[in-house]
C-alpha cells in the first residue's frame, strides 16, 4: 500500500501479493457522502484483491477526499472521467499489468463506464472488464434521491418541525447534501446520463451487482442492454450493500459481495494471503491548494496521517484532528481537509489522523460500532501521535475534535503533558465505562433501525417508488436520532454510591476534575456546543446550565454557538470551529511570548487569570 498523487488527485497503490500480476484494478469511488460511507469497504476490497494477486489503484477525485480543490467544481464529471483514465495508465506503468479492470460503485460505476468509453478510443487502451456495483443507471433518478436525502437533513424550525418538501439548495444554485456540493453544470451532466441508452457495451465482460433486484431493477435493464450489445454479463445480488451504505460509525465490509468480486476477477488465486504492509516513501510531499501535505506513518507504522504545513514556513504550532466516530481522516463533509489547509495558509500546521483501527491505517478494522470510538485503544493511539509530534519539535500541540473526537481530544490532554490546547465540539461523553457499552447496545431495535434507515441512501429509491412516505421517515428518524444522542449524553447508568452512601454522578465528578486538572496545567481549552446540540444535556449536568462550575478555571472557556451543527458538516460550522482554533492558538502564542520575555528579564512566570 503506497501513497501516490497524480493530476491533483491523492490515492493509494495496493501492490499484489505473490508473483507478477497480469491484471490490475482501478477502484472508482462513489461521490459526495457516499464516498465517506463506503471508504471502509472500498479500502478493504482493495486489500482483498491485492492479497489475491491483483494490484489495485484507488484514489480521491479532484475536489474530494485528500485531493486538491474545494469541492463542487463545475467540471466534476469530465475531470473525474479523465482521472480514471489517467489512473488506469498509471496502474499499468507502476505494476506492468497488461489488462486493467475498472471497478466502481454508485456514481463511481457510472464514471467507470464513461472512462471505459474514453479508453476505447486509444488502441489497446480499453479495459478488459468492468465491475459495476449498484451503478447509477438513471442520472435523473439519482438526483431525486439526493434531493430526498437533502430534505431529510433540512433545518428544523423552532418547534422541531422539518420542512421535508424543500430541497437543501435550489437547482439553479446547485445541490448541497451534508456539505458536499454539486454545481449546476455537474447536475446537468449527471441528469442527462442513461447508461442503458448509450450505444454498444463499454467492455467485453461485465459484472453487475444489483442492490435492488426485482421487476423494477435498473441494473437488470442495464444487463440486458449490454448482453444485446454482445458483452458477457454476470449479475449477482448485492443484498449486503446495506452493511456498507450507512454512516461510518456503524458500517461494515459486505464480505459476501467482496468474495464474489475477488473470485470473479481472480478465480485461480491461491489461498488468501496477508496484504503487503504499507511502505513509507522517502518523499511524500504533495503541493496542494497553496500548502504542502505529507503522508506520514506514526507509532511504528500503526497509524496513518496527513501532515499539512505552510509552504516554506516553520509553523509555531500544530492542530491534531482525530477521527470522528468511524469516519476516516478527511472528516465528515471533508471538514478536516478544509480546516487543515485553512490553518496552513494562516501559518500553522495540522495533522489529520487515522487511529490504528480506522481509515487508511494498516490495521483498520472491517467493521465499526460506536463504543469502539471510545475504547482504550484509540485513546492510546492519539497520545502516541502527540508524542510523535513532540519528538519532531512541535512545542504547541492543540487537539481539535468533534463528538467522539472531542472525547479523544480531552483524553489525550489528560494523558499527555505535551498537549497545550484543546478545542472540543459537541462532546456527548466525558467518561466512557463498561456500562456505556451496555447502554448503547440495549436500545430498542426500532430506534437503531430508524438510524440505519435514515443514513441508508438505498431507502430513497423505495421512497421514490412510493413505498413509504417521506414525512413519516423524516419525523420518526429525526426524533429517534435526537433521542439516541440525548440518551448517550445523559448517561443514566453513570451514578454510583459514594463512601458515605450518597449517590455520586461519576461522569459529573470526572468531568469537573478533568477540567480543574487541565486548567491547573495551563492547557487552554475551549468547550463548544451548538445552541440546540444534544450534548448540552451532558454539559449542563456536569458543569451547570450556565457552565458556572467552569467560571473559576482560568484556562477553560465554554461557548454556545449559533452556527455549529453536531457533526460540523456545514460550512458555517467549520468557520465557527476555525475561529475558535485560531483564538486558542493565538492565546497560547501570546502566553508563550510573555513567558519568554519574563524569562529573559529574570522575572517569575505570571499566574493564569480567568478567561473573560
Language-model-detected regions and their locations in the chain:
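Gly/Ala-rich beta-loop-alpha elbow adjacent to hydrolase catalytic centers
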Residues: 103-113, 134, 400-409
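Conserved hydrolase catalytic core segment
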Residues: 114-129, 407, 411-421
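Short, surface-exposed "cap/lid" segments of acyl-processing enzymes
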Residues: 16-60, 310-354
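N-terminal cap/lid segment of alpha/beta-hydrolase-fold proteins
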Residues: 1-23, 263, 267-314, 570
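Catalytic active-site module of serine/aspartate enzymes centered on a nucleophile-bearing elbow/loop
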Residues: 243, 248-289, 562-612
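Alpha/beta-hydrolase active-site loop
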Residues: 41, 73-94, 368-392
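Glycine-rich "HGGG/HGxG" loop immediately N-terminal to the catalytic nucleophile
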Residues: 60-75, 353-370
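The alpha/beta-hydrolase serine catalytic core
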Residues: 125-258, 262, 418-578
